[in-house]
Amino acid sequence: MSVTGGSKDEILHKPVLLSEALKFLAPKNGGVYVDATFGAGGYTRAILSSVDCFVYAIDRDETVRRFFQVIENDFPKRTNFINGNFVDIGSLLGEVKVDGIVFDLGVSTMQLKVADRGFSFLHEGPLDMRMDRSTLLTAETVVNSYTEVKIASIIYQFGEERMSRKIAHAIVNARRKKRITTTSSLAEIVRSCFPKRYYKIDPATKTFQALRIFINDELGALECGLRTALTMLKVGSRAVVVSFHSLEDRIVKHLFRSVHGNGFNLLTKKIVVPSRDEVRENPSSRSARMRVIEKV
């Protein structure tokens, strides 16, 4: 999930691959759609603006409700916000059958910019990383209380980081001297494990990704939630998924391929990626990948 802009732009932001998503969703008058990862509401607003339809907006982050209220004022009685995790999409929506669902995965730039959420090493903040702040497990708990072996496993499995063991060892050594409580302190510990030279991405990137994915059970939620979502589609309706790293995309690819030809038709034989113009305008979109499947 990638978002650009400041406070005003957050409300009016353009999501990655928006025109492609709308093309595949093909919203119709009277249709019912689901934005399973509402965020700042870019997809919800675009769908509502395209035709006279209804959109269920789901997000586990209660703080995004302020963005929904703006959209609700613009499109009264045409949308409903549900504060919940899309892993529970079946129970959140009940027996509703829908005309299309969009998933825009990962953490948004909007969330990354809020220092006290602890998602980014670019902003000094507490080691939190919870998308749903009503849950208990934080990144601070993981790095200060989990075993070295467990920390290494998390970093390797969810960050695909080859230096995972060295990083875990450095974390455990550092916490013996002082509790690790901030994003900057963790980032410095991770960076100390790498030779001092230029890197295309910050050496701390994969470790922060791994902790965030683990704490929020992002991959487990994706597989379960997406599988349930497919059962909610009407014939001729589509699920559009935008992912931002290989772990997410692998789950989507394998699930879509497993149901292709068995009541579903895979519409994207190859992944859809942003155009050069979009990447130039929004560099954080460069890793986005879209896959689409249709109920037949």
From Swiss-Prot:
<keyword id="KW-0489">Methyltransferase</keyword>
<dbReference type="InterPro" id="IPR023397">
    <property type="entry name" value="SAM-dep_MeTrfase_MraW_recog"/>
</dbReference>
<dbReference type="GO" id="GO:0071424">
    <property type="term" value="F:rRNA (cytosine-N4-)-methyltransferase activity"/>
</dbReference>
<keyword id="KW-0698">rRNA processing</keyword>
<dbReference type="Pfam" id="PF01795">
    <property type="entry name" value="Methyltransf_5"/>
</dbReference>
<feature type="binding site">
    <location>
        <position position="111"/>
    </location>
    <ligand>
        <name>S-adenosyl-L-methionine</name>
    </ligand>
</feature>
<feature type="binding site">
    <location>
        <position position="86"/>
    </location>
    <ligand>
        <name>S-adenosyl-L-methionine</name>
    </ligand>
</feature>
<dbReference type="InterPro" id="IPR029063">
    <property type="entry name" value="SAM-dependent_MTases_sf"/>
</dbReference>
<dbReference type="GO" id="GO:0070475">
    <property type="term" value="P:rRNA base methylation"/>
</dbReference>
<keyword id="KW-0808">Transferase</keyword>
<feature type="binding site">
    <location>
        <begin position="41"/>
        <end position="43"/>
    </location>
    <ligand>
        <name>S-adenosyl-L-methionine</name>
    </ligand>
</feature>
<comment type="similarity">
    <text>Belongs to the methyltransferase superfamily. RsmH family.</text>
</comment>
<comment type="function">
    <text>Specifically methylates the N4 position of cytidine in position 1402 (C1402) of 16S rRNA.</text>
</comment>
<dbReference type="InterPro" id="IPR002903">
    <property type="entry name" value="RsmH"/>
</dbReference>
<feature type="binding site">
    <location>
        <position position="104"/>
    </location>
    <ligand>
        <name>S-adenosyl-L-methionine</name>
    </ligand>
</feature>
<keyword id="KW-0949">S-adenosyl-L-methionine</keyword>
<protein>
    <recommendedName>
        <fullName>Ribosomal RNA small subunit methyltransferase H</fullName>
        <ecNumber>2.1.1.199</ecNumber>
    </recommendedName>
</protein>
<keyword id="KW-0963">Cytoplasm</keyword>
<feature type="binding site">
    <location>
        <position position="59"/>
    </location>
    <ligand>
        <name>S-adenosyl-L-methionine</name>
    </ligand>
</feature>
<dbReference type="GO" id="GO:0005737">
    <property type="term" value="C:cytoplasm"/>
</dbReference>
